[in-house]
A protein has these predicted regions:
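Contiguous segments within soluble domain cores/interaction surfaces
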Residues: 6-140
Length: 140
């Protein structure tokens, strides 16, 4: 006797991967072309130099692109702290995904970010409380 195979699960349950981070940039600005929707990234940097501490960086953008995000509402959290200290949550924002195939560009503005001393500041990026990137920003 041959038993028929059970029906396959719906497509939405076949792929349950965690979101993938395709791009992470620290920059001075992002221009979105109103005609094409293309993003132009301005002034990419990877460290901050100061003459004295504490120092306050007046404005920066953390630009990121995500893919493989399941449809629905989600939360992006970004925390930062000096190596060896507890990170402070700087950002907690909602975003929405229409499909895991879509690429989602998120532009996150940070104003008056204070650095009390030089060092490597750890940055943790989470989507729905799942870490997707741990990196650092050097401040000298």
């Amino acid at each position: 006797m041959i038993c028929p195979a059970p029906p396959p699960p719906p497509c939405s349950t076949l792929v349950q991967s965690k979101p993938q981070l395709l791009a992470w940039l620290t920059c001075d600005g992002v221009h979105i072309d109103p005609g094409s929707g293309k993003h132009t990234i301005l002034g990419i940097f990877s460290n901050i130099q100061a003459r004295q501490f504490p120092v306050t960086h007046p404005f920066m953008i953390w630009f990121l692109t995500l893919s493989d995000v399941s449809p629905g509402k989600h939360a992006l959290k970004i925390s930062m702290g000096l190596e060896g200290t507890a990170p402070q949550q700087l950002l907690d924002r909602p975003f929405e995904s229409q499909s895991p195939l879509h690429r989602i560009n998120l532009i996150n503005e940070l104003r008056n970010l204070r650095f009390d001393q030089p060092g490597d500041y750890s940055i943790l990026i989470e989507v729905d409380d799942e870490p997707i990137l741990a990196t650092s920003l050097t401040v000298t």
